[in-house]
Amino acid sequence: MLAMHCARVCSVLMGCRTTTRALSIRSFPGVTLAQIDEEVAKLLELKAHLGGDDGKHQFVLKTAKGTRDYNPKQMAIREKVFNTIVSCFKRHGAETIDTPVFELKETLTGKYGEDSKLIYDLKDQGGELLSLRYDLTVPFARYLAMNKITNIKRYHIAKVYRRDNPAMTRGRYREFYQCDFDIAGQYDAMIPDAECLKIVHEILSELDLGDFRIKVNDRRILDGMFAVCGVPDNMFRTICSTVDKLDKLPWEAVKNEMVNEKGLSEEAADQIGVYVGMQGGMDLAERLLQDQKMCQSTQACAGLTDIKLLFSYLQLFQVTDKVVFDLSLARGLDYYTGIIYEAILTQAGVAPVAPETSNEAPTEECVTVGSVAGGGRYDGLVGMFDPKGRKVPCVGVSIGIERIFSIMEQKAEASTEKIRTTEVQVMVAAAQKNLLEERLRLITELWNAGIKAELMYKKSPKLLSQLQHCEESGIPLVAILGEQELKNGVVKLRNVATRDEVDISRADLIAEIKKRTSA
């Protein structure tokens, strides 16, 4: 019965897609076309699993759940973003490493708290229990411990895997890239931490995604706050994971989880509620250092003192306008030991998306993309892998690249600007027939000189077709060969945008192309 129902729904969706879209949008004003497509895809997938109209299993050619393909335009956008990020990392003196895409399961176990359930385990093929890497931080710590490295400034860009419930319209996937920057070593307090925040500020500013905020807190402040509010020691991590949901859920829902699901007393939850509503800057840190309750925790006082120092360095880095001290920031990963931070877009210049937990239409106030960068200090992680427990202090940041890609793609779709998918500088074209050999000789000269060039794979292509290809692909120059040009020892160089043409001697052609394309 279910199979018949799903098949009927899918056939309606497939046969009347436009009408269905229109009905859905009119009936649910908060729903986007992308979300409708996502739901339709799920129904079609279910229909295929249950069987087609004849009851037989049908194979659906598709990507795995939570993954996607990228077309040339999307890859051009991604490459631009990657180049911006790598350029920033290198500007700050980082070197790069790489680690295996899968690790021993034991390497990853116990490092992520409640998020450990999202780790992908692999079937045992050779006596080792393996898991796909969940992030790039734990493999980095393992790398430091294995190689006995005590200081390094490194960046790493690679794919990670999470068995999460994907929301692909909001840039959440099961396979995605992370771009990490970390500083390992024993240094004076808060200097490396401040540089990590400076890097986040630089990258988000250069990508021009719109306005953003960087929230900072400290795990020692959180633990001290939990202690003075009456949270039992053995509940610190689980309550921290619940507080971490405040960026997605209202306080009442978070409190309900603390009290009714995790067994925290209502009094303790109410006291936590007072603190997690606080935001500010250095002034808030100074105020909390005078708070009678907070002063009872030496941990919290140490964290607050470091927050003050951090803000003094951030002032020198000229980034305090975007940074806010937010006591609700928790970051649920177990390995953080000190400063933590997270960057969110405040949506200026970003297309509205429907709220995740409401049936209301999106508004400027409720629009959110989620975190686009996050990180913190993890001084104990390397010691977990060292046989003698030797610690290497570390601090780092991870850029949430997939969400940034989603925003950049939205902006590109809304823009009239043409996206180039190749870097070809010049097209080698022929004005008459039977000039293939001459075109091949010329393009070989250009390639040997390091010029990016291409030609049409026809013996006698029409000149108009060659010029149209240049306009469609954004190729700026055309080197045109004809019988007269060959006789005179010149090449006609055409500017595709202005359509101006000039004869250039064969000997000067390479220098002229390089001069015109050097900007």
Curated annotation (Swiss-Prot):
A GO BP annotation: histidyl-tRNA aminoacylation
Enzyme class: ligase
Pfam families associated with the record: HGTP_anticodon (PF03129), tRNA-synt_His (PF13393)
Primary location: cytoplasm
Reaction catalysis annotation: tRNA(His) + L-histidine + ATP = L-histidyl-tRNA(His) + AMP + diphosphate + H(+)
Keywords: Aminoacyl-tRNA synthetase, ATP-binding, Cytoplasm, Ligase, Nucleotide-binding, Protein biosynthesis
Domain of life of the source: Eukaryota
Localisation: Cytoplasm
Residues involved in L-histidine binding: 135-137, 162, 178, 182, 331, 335-336
GO function term, MF aspect, one: histidine-tRNA ligase activity
EC number: 6.1.1.21
Gene Ontology cellular component terms for the protein in this record: cytoplasm; cytosol; mitochondrion
Family the entry assigns: Belongs to the class-II aminoacyl-tRNA synthetase family.
Subunit structure: Homodimer.
Function: Catalyzes the ATP-dependent ligation of histidine to the 3'-end of its cognate tRNA, via the formation of an aminoacyl-adenylate intermediate (His-AMP). Plays a role in axon guidance.
Protein name in UniProt: Histidine--tRNA ligase, cytoplasmic
Organism: Takifugu rubripes (Japanese pufferfish)
Upper lineage: Eukaryota, Metazoa, Chordata, Craniata, Vertebrata
Gene that produces this protein: hars1
